[in-house]
From Swiss-Prot:
Source superkingdom: Archaea
InterPro entries attached to this UniProt entry: MEMO1_fam (IPR002737)
Organism: Pyrobaculum islandicum (strain DSM 4184 / JCM 9189 / GEO3)
PANTHER family according to UniProt: PROTEIN MEMO1
SUPFAM superfamilies: LigB-like
CDD domains with a match to the protein in the record: MEMO_like
Name of the protein in its database record: MEMO1 family protein Pisl_1105
Family: Belongs to the MEMO1 family.
Length: 281
């Protein structure tokens, strides 16, 4: 059995189980956090949302928002976690269709059945364990999932070829696979927003991009990111989620929380933007 060991425990989040649980509780109760492990659900059903993936001390309170909102809709059978490939390792679009991911909170199993269905609808997806070896954008979501939902399966997908066409193909494949799967699946698009500019600039750039997400406009998202140099590291995963949402009839999108690393660290000269966004109907 393939075991993906933690790559950033002790760096992005606490490596000790009890300290990690305390850190997750801190994120929830933080002044920028949701304050509660579950907020009232916004609609009848959810498809998932966008969550940041920086170190918990920076983005944890914002990330807690989307998981608190998802918890209001109940526990899914599986989380599909789509992240950017920051290191360019492995296949252009990679998936793991078997094995487990390990964190200080325990192991989560990959849902091979759903992974196979996604691969059948998107032929360019490659089963590539190596592509995930260092990638933190997926890893940092898993302790949140374990804390809020307990034992639940995952399907990890990572993208370094972040084009609009890739997002569309993947989004349609996800929609088709979820329909065929017939059980409850939530998608997490793991992404930070603008990088390494002053808090005020990052905030304004982020707002332009978030506006397109709220309009379910994947084309507009890619266009504003290019035109205004908005460095959204997970634009491909977000685009795929938007496409899947439209295919499956999830037409409501709500921004739960937007902040920058300047809000959590106090250093506002070079910041990274974070947003929690939920898709529902």
């Amino acid at each position: 059995m393939r075991v993906r060991k933690p790559a950033v425990a002790g760096y992005f989040y606490e490596s000790d189980r009890e300290k990690l649980l305390q850190q997750l509780e801190w994120a929830i109760k933080h002044e920028l956090g949701p304050k509660a492990p579950q907020i009232p659900k916004l609609g009848a059903e959810t498809l998932g949302g966008v969550a940041p993936h920086a170190g918990y001390i920076y983005s944890g309170p914002v990330a807690a928002w989307v998981y608190s909102a998802l918890a209001g809709f109940g526990k899914p059978d599986v989380f599909i976690i789509i992240g950017p490939n920051h290191y360019g390792i492995g296949a252009p679009v990679a998936i793991m269709k078997s094995g487990v991911w390990e964190t200080p909170l325990g192991r989560v199993e990959i849902d091979g059945e759903l992974a196979e269905k996604i691969m059948r609808y998107f032929k360019e997806l490659e089963d590539d364990f190596h592509a995930f070896s260092r990638e933190h954008s997926i890893e940092v979501q898993i302790p949140f999932i374990q804390y809020f939902f307990g034992d639940v399966k995952i399907v990890p997908i990572t993208i370094w070829r972040q084009t609009l066409s890739t997002s569309r193909e993947l989004g349609k494949a996800l929609a088709n696979a979820i329909r065929e799967y017939g059980r409850r699946a939530y998608i997490i698009a793991s992404s930070d927003f603008n990088h390494y500019e002053h808090h005020d600039i990052t905030t304004k750039k982020d707002e332009m991009a978030i506006g397109k997400i709220l309009q379910l406009d994947e084309t507009g998202l890619f266009e504003v990111a290019s035109k205004f140099d908005i460095s959204i590291c997970g634009i491909g995963p977000i685009g795929a989620l938007i496409v899947a949402a439209k295919e499956l009839g999830y037409k409501n999108v709500t921004l739960l929380k937007h902040a920058t690393s300047g809000d959590t660290s106090g250093y506002r000269e070079e910041t990274v933007g974070y947003a929690s966004i939920i898709f529902y109907r």
